[in-house]
């Protein structure tokens, strides 16, 4: 077998920033920061959402800190090219 062709598979500390929950698991993700957890130093990777904070798994509806791309587009450009309301159409006649 050839050497050095596989990514480094190591223990990584994932942090769900919305729920403030830490997960220690193995992954090939590359990180620049490390953090101490339960007396050992691990590579650290922050997450916006995980199973600890996702509405499907928690059963509660909550707003996330980031919007979807479609929602932000509609927020910016929703008024352009839309249909006129009935009151506006009557006033125009």
UniProtKB/Swiss-Prot annotation:
Q: Which UniProt keywords apply?
A: Ribonucleoprotein, Ribosomal protein
Is this entry keyworded Translocase? no
Keyword Manganese in annotation: no
Q: Which Pfam families match?
A: Ribosomal_L31 (PF01197)
User: GO molecular function terms here?
Assistant: structural constituent of ribosome
> Listed disulfide bonds for this chain?
none
- Cite a GO CC annotation: ribonucleoprotein complex
What is any one GO biological process for this UniProt entry?
Answer: translation
InterPro entries linked: Ribosomal_bL28/bL31-like_sf, Ribosomal_bL31, Ribosomal_bL31_B, Ribosomal_bL31_sf
The record's NCBIfam families line, in alphabetical order, gives:
L31, PRK01678.1
> Subunit notes for this chain?
Part of the 50S ribosomal subunit.
Give the record's family classification: Belongs to the bacterial ribosomal protein bL31 family. Type B subfamily.
HAMAP family of this UniProt entry?
Answer: Ribosomal_bL31_2 (MF_00502)
Q: What is this protein called?
A: Large ribosomal subunit protein bL31B
From which source organism is this entry? Psychrobacter cryohalolentis (strain ATCC BAA-1226 / DSM 17306 / VKM B-2378 / K5)
């Amino acid at each position: 077998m050839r050497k050095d062709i596989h990514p480094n598979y190591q223990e990584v500390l994932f942090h769900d920033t919305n729920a403030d929950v830490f997960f220690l698991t193995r992954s090939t993700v590359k990180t620049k920061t490390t953090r101490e957890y339960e007396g050992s130093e691990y590579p650290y990777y922050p997450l916006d959402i995980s199973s600890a904070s996702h509405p499907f798994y928690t059963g509660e509806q909550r707003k996330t800190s980031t919007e979807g791309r479609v929602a932000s587009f509609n927020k910016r450009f929703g008024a352009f090219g839309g249909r006129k309301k009935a009151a506006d159409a009557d006033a125009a006649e």
